[in-house]
């Protein structure tokens, strides 16, 4: 009974120590292992976003319930990440804890982060090809493809400051969800701990750079390569989505959101909690 109570009431310092050990373990993996795990994470993130798009495809975007249900569905991607132990860029920035401990150099940390990001992109690209050739874009009278276009278009009109801020808040929620999952004794505990923070960031429209690497390039592909029957079913045209270009995506969304994600995860969660709970440790 005492051991059980001790576990339930263990100090946040222990969670910080667990997070730091996990960070060091991730960095210690081989480059091939890191890349393959990151590819899996990219696939899982795309799966979660596909579930989200399938739910909102034929629903009014103004309905709060739609955002809530869509957010809950999106958590599938993060549940798969937690269960399978893969590496997502936005959570891997927490490995900065290992740098502050002196376990690794900045060069090692940067190489690991870039490798994870490239692996995430490769996984997303593979799953995107499957989605494209599956014909899902044309399903429900092209409503699925239209949902992709509108979702991506809405992400392209934020200012730089807005994108950074939305990125900070997003990865704050993602990394806090991961931090909370360290408290769980069972798989169910970990999943339940993650649901609300992830649902919050999705329902609130916060920006996640890896999720955006799926939906925005996919929308750009639809804009340029969708066949005429798609636009007929959609009662629209490619000219209605002028913001969906590669250059605009990189400058207006990807880079500022990635910067915000790094700040939210590496600074506001990892470094902050390490300074609070582990600063006095040797």
From Swiss-Prot:
Record keywords, A-Z: Cell inner membrane, Cell membrane, Membrane, Transmembrane, Transmembrane helix, Transport
Biological role stated in the UniProt entry: Involved in the bidirectional transport of formate during mixed-acid fermentation.
Regulation of catalytic or functional activity: The direction of formate translocation depends on external pH and electron donor source.
Topology of the protein relative to the lipid bilayer: Multi-pass membrane protein
Organism in which the protein naturally occurs: Escherichia coli (strain K12)
Catalysis: reaction(s): formate(in) = formate(out)
Matching InterPro entries: Aquaporin-like, For/NO2_transpt, For/NO2_transpt_CS
Residues annotated as transmembrane: 36-56, 69-89, 113-133, 164-184, 191-211, 249-269
UniProt key word Membrane: yes
Family in the record: Belongs to the FNT transporter (TC 1.A.16) family.
Gene Ontology MF term list: formate transmembrane transporter activity
NCBIfam families: fnt, PRK09713.1
Record flagged with keyword Membrane: yes
Disruption phenotype: When both FocA and FocB are missing, an unidentified system can transport formate.
GO biological process: formate transport; mixed acid fermentation
Pfam families cross-referenced by the UniProt entry: Form_Nir_trans
Subcellular location: Cell inner membrane
Membrane side Cytoplasmic: residue ranges: 1-35, 90-112, 185-190, 270-282
Protein's name according to its UniProt entry: Formate channel FocB
Organismal lineage: Bacteria, Pseudomonadati, Pseudomonadota, Gammaproteobacteria, Enterobacterales
């Amino acid at each position: 009974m005492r051991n059980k109570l001790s576990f339930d009431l263990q100090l946040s310092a222990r969670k910080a120590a667990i997070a730091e050990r996990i960070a060091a373990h991730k960095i210690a993996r081989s480059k091939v292992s890191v890349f393959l795990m990151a590819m899996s994470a990219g696939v899982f993130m795309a799966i979660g976003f596909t579930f989200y798009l399938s739910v909102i495809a034929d629903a009014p975007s103004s309905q709060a319930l739609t955002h809530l249900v869509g957010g809950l569905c999106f958590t599938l991607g993060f549940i798969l990440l937690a269960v399978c132990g893969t590496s997502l860029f936005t959570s891997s920035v927490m490995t900065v804890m290992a740098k502050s401990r002196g376990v690794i150099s900045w060069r090692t940390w940067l190489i690991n982060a870039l490798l994870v990001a490239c692996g995430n992109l490769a996984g997303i690209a593979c799953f995107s090809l499957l989605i494209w050739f599956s014909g899902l874009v044309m399903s429900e009278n092209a409503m699925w493809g239209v949902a992709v276009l509108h979702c991506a278009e809405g992400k392209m009109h934020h200012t730089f400051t807005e994108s950074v801020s939305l990125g900070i808040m997003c990865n704050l929620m993602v990394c806090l969800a991961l931090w909370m999952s360290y408290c769980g004794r069972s798989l169910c505990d970990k999943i339940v701990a993650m649901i609300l923070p992830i649902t919050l960031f999705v329902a609130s429209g916060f920006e996640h750079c890896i999720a955006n690497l799926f939906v925005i390039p996919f929308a750009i592909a639809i804009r340029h390569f969708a066949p005429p029957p798609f636009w007929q079913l959609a009662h629209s045209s490619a000219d209605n989505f002028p913001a969906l270009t590669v250059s605009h995506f990189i400058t207006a969304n990807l880079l500022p959101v990635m910067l915000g994600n790094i700040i939210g995860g590496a600074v506001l969660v990892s470094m902050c909690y390490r300074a609070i709970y582990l600063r006095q440790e040797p």
